[in-house]
């Protein structure tokens, strides 16, 4: 039996899509009603699920999958993560946000986590 966390507790919010808002990448609120891509080290508000017609659907809570750029693979459990500047996340010791990592795919460099 395969374990799936897809759609558990997902909370989507629609924003205007600003610069750098791209599907599958972390984002930040950059202006009124608008999300944009994050610079390295910035805290992120969610993960862009879709961009269409100038709007972005953002997963703000629940399960999401994101790329990671740590040289050492993160471990399952709670971790403090921030944007890596390339649409993914990296582990940080200060700043960022706490997330529950439930799956690490070292080969694909992706994390399954709860926001």
Model-derived features: where do they sit?
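Surface-exposed, low-hydrophobicity beta-strand/loop segments enriched in small/polar/acidic residues
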Residues: 1-115
